[in-house]
Design a protein with these regions (language model features):
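S-adenosylmethionine
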Residues: 1-436
Length: 436
């Protein structure tokens, strides 16, 4: 167990040094080349779990320590161990003993008796005082919800009827959702294919299936053949909202990693241009298209500039703009702790440059779908309202997010295009604009 604790502690330490978990975890794993697949899997679970509930765990440790711990690696190890004591099924005394042993494995001056004694004492005090600690924190919102206070306050103001459920949903394990290419296989046939391989699944939309138990992608039937893709149900709403028709000229701006580009090409025979500012990210888009046996014109360029554009207008534009990603926090648990309140305004400013730039490239009568994976109003309807005030030739079109009684979870809770995160989907925002 101590190997997994050490890996997770290193990853958590990196995150609090400013690195996102997607990069931090592989880097931490590379330090332990002899780790078994089971140890690596456990380390990933501990990393995600610790960051998911850091607000709660950190509040407990604050009460247990006389003063802040200056050694950040020891503190990260304590965070991981307290997460295990709170949320893991492992035996409590095994967790404590393994954490103490982990200290001795650190190749640092901290691997001394004082550090081992500190870790042992804090963890055992936590076990003894757990009930009293819980009582003391019952009014501490950061501890209760495991979000920064500014985030909690913002949702309270913007979603007075939904803020608690949104916070709680963000702390759940995300579902694994598939998008079935119904041009290649029907939903019925694909569900039967899953059943033959003893993979339980529930259809929740016209092309969406949630797996009861997440699978490695290489074990998903038809994935390598392009029959299915992994994509959140909320993200699957983009392509249908674009009102696609064959032969239209379509732009997917800020396209990486390419899930929506693939869905657009599966939906209609269009002339597809996919834009991203990062060439390395476009390589991932190309790999995804190769798997799906689809083609698009991939362009390295800045969506806030027209310098890359040939001047021929697009009939449809998907503007999936950079954002705080506050609506997909259950998939990216580090976002809660890496984001700062000031970042919201920074993203709003970036979006405000992209929208007018893309609008110039839209044909008259064309449609632009503005998309974020955020739940913050400033980035969403607030951004759209400002754009409409400044552009008389823009109209926001009403739309219905798809409901079909054949599927048990298809009815989506949304407020003016804002998906309220639920067990079935993440918190995306959609606004459909037409050029008059």
């Amino acid at each position: 167990m101590y190997i997994s604790q050490l890996i997770a502690a290193d990853a958590v330490h990196q995150v609090f040094s400013g690195r996102n978990l997607t990069l931090a975890l592989p880097a931490a794993l590379s330090l332990f080349p002899a780790a078994t697949p089971q140890q690596k899997g456990a380390a990933a679970d501990l990393s995600y779990g610790t960051l998911r509930f850091y607000g709660e765990i950190g509040a407990y440790l604050t009460q247990l320590m006389e003063k802040p711990l200056t050694d950040e690696r020891i503190y990260a190890l304590l965070l991981v161990a307290v997460y295990q004591l709170l949320h893991d099924k492992a035996d409590s005394f095994t967790v404590v003993n393994q954490a103490v042993h982990a200290v001795s494995q650190l190749k640092r001056p901290t691997a001394k008796s004082w550090a081992k004694g500190l870790v042992n004492g804090i963890l055992r005090n936590f076990l003894r005082q757990k009930d009293q600690l819980i009582h003391k924190l019952k009014m501490n919102e950061v501890a209760i919800y495991s979000y920064p206070q500014w985030w909690i306050n913002k949702l309270k103001i913007q979603y007075p009827d939904h803020w608690q459920s949104m916070l709680e949903t963000g702390n759940q394990h995300p579902p694994m959702t598939l998008r079935v290419n119904t041009q290649k296989i029907s939903m019925t046939d694909y569900l039967q294919l899953l059943a033959r391989q003893d993979i339980e699944a529930t259809p929740i939309g016209a092309q969406a299936i949630i797996l009861t138990k997440p699978q490695a992608v290489e074990k998903i039937p038809g994935f390598n053949d392009g029959i299915v893709s992994v994509q959140d149900y909320g993200a699957q709403l983009a392509a249908p909202l674009l009102d696609l028709k064959d032969k239209l000229k379509v732009l997917d701006a800020c396209c990486a990693p390419g899930g929506k580009t693939g869905h657009i090409l599966e939906s209609a025979n269009v002339a597809m241009t996919s834009l991203d500012s990062d060439e390395s990210r476009l390589q991932r888009v190309q790999s995804n298209l190769d798997r799906l046996s689809l083609e698009a014109n991939l362009v390295v360029g800045d969506a806030s500039s027209t310098s890359w554009w040939d001047g021929v207008p697009f009939d449809r534009i998907l503007a999936d703009v950079p954002c705080t990603a506050s609506g997909i926090v259950r998939r990216h648990v580090d976002i809660k702790w890496l984001r700062r309140e000031a970042d919201v305004a920074s993203f709003v400013a970036q979006q405000a440059k992209i929208l007018p730039s893309l609008w110039q490239m839209l044909a008259k009568g064309g449609k632009l779908l503005y998309v974020t994976c955020s739940v913050f109003y400033e980035e969403n309807q607030g951004q759209v309202d400002k754009f409409l005030q400044q552009n008389a030739d823009a109209t926001q079109l009403p739309f219905a997010l798809f409901t079909n009684d054949h599927y048990s979870q298809t009815n989506i809770t949304h407020i003016n295009g804002q998906l309220i995160p639920s067990t079935a989907h993440d918190g995306f925002f959609y606004a459909l604009l037409q050029k008059n």
